Regions:
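N-terminal secretion-targeting helices of virulence/extracellular proteins
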Residues: 1-103
Length: 103
């Protein structure tokens, strides 16, 4: 049987992991938007021709994938929080039943 302290520690750990995933997703979004997008704009301004167009299209697809991955990571973090809350509530309810039970 889990103790109240271990339930709370596990809940906080899960929330901390979700926060880390959100931070990674935020960093990926920033990288994709400002840094990578700026690089593609510089390339577009300074490199002309068929190969340049193909390379920029490839870069745009990569940028879209990076944004999609960031969105997916945010979704995973939200799911972790939801599951952690449900598990926390269930474990606390089970603990309350165990404490109230008289043998």
């Amino acid at each position: 049987m889990a103790t109240r302290e271990s339930i709370e520690i596990n809940f906080k750990a899960a929330l901390g992991q979700a926060d880390k995933i959100d931070n990674i997703a935020d960093n990926l979004s920033k990288l994709s938007g400002a840094k990578f997008g700026g690089t593609l704009q510089n390339l577009s301004a300074n490199w002309k021709g068929e190969n340049a167009s193909l390379y920029l299209e490839k870069g745009s697809r990569l940028q879209e994938k990076m944004n999609g991955t960031a969105e997916g990571l945010h979704s995973v973090a939200a799911d972790i929080r939801t599951i952690a809350r449900r598990l926390y509530e269930a474990e606390m309810a089970a603990l309350a039943v165990a404490v109230d039970r008289a043998y």
